[in-house]
């Protein structure tokens, strides 16, 4: 988990400093693509025969790397509240990636991330960044398919409970 955050924070710092200086209206587009690469590398590592994780910790690193305190705090609070109430970590995980996708799209379409919405190239970069973030979040949800099925059948393991024997 720590490696995910270190890697994503380094990538975010490089993108903010280098890309932000050269292309200030496209920083979040490049952050989204850097995040997508990180998630793809985590979910489908070639050295594990393309069988990796579900991408939640990596997506959490992306959320932190976007440096938006509103999104970071709201996702953290939602995760804590949902896990505390339901004791389902998977439900909390699915919730935060959904929240991140929705909040990012709303904030981006309202010009929060420096996109010049009056400029066609900047507007297109904003739309593209929203699509990339949606792909990242969609991958995390799809990779939780088995957890979603277990949640619907009330068979998902709860935090702190002994695992059910299958």
Outline where the language-model segments fall.
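Helix-coil boundary and interhelical linker segments in multi-pass alpha-helical membrane proteins
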Residues: 10-33, 64-71, 106-131
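Interfacial segments of multi-pass membrane proteins
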Residues: 15-19, 56-86, 98-108
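Cytosolic, membrane-interface loops and tails of multi-pass inner-membrane proteins
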Residues: 52, 149-166
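Short, small-residue-biased leader/transition segments that mark boundaries at the very start
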Residues: 1-5
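Transmembrane alpha-helix interface/packing and boundary motifs in multi-pass membrane proteins
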Residues: 39-50, 82-89
């Amino acid at each position: 988990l720590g490696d995910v955050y270190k890697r994503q924070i380094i990538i975010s710092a490089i993108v903010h400093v280098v890309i932000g200086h050269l292309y200030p209206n496209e920083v979040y587009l490049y952050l989204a693509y850097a995040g997508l690469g990180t998630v793809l590398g985590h979910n489908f590592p070639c050295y594990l025969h393309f069988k990796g994780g579900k991408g939640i910790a990596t997506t959490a690193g992306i959320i932190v790397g976007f440096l938006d305190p509103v999104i970071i705090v709201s996702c953290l609070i939602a995760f804590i509240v949902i896990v505390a109430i339901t004791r389902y970590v998977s439900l909390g995980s699915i919730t935060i990636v959904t929240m991140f996708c929705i909040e990012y799209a709303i904030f981006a379409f309202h010009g929060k991330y420096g996109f010049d919405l009056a400029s066609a190239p900047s507007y297109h970069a904003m739309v593209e960044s929203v699509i990339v973030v949606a792909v990242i979040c969609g991958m995390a949800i799809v990779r939780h398919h088995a957890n979603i099925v277990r949640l619907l059948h009330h068979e998902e393991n709860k935090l702190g409970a002994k695992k059910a024997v299958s």
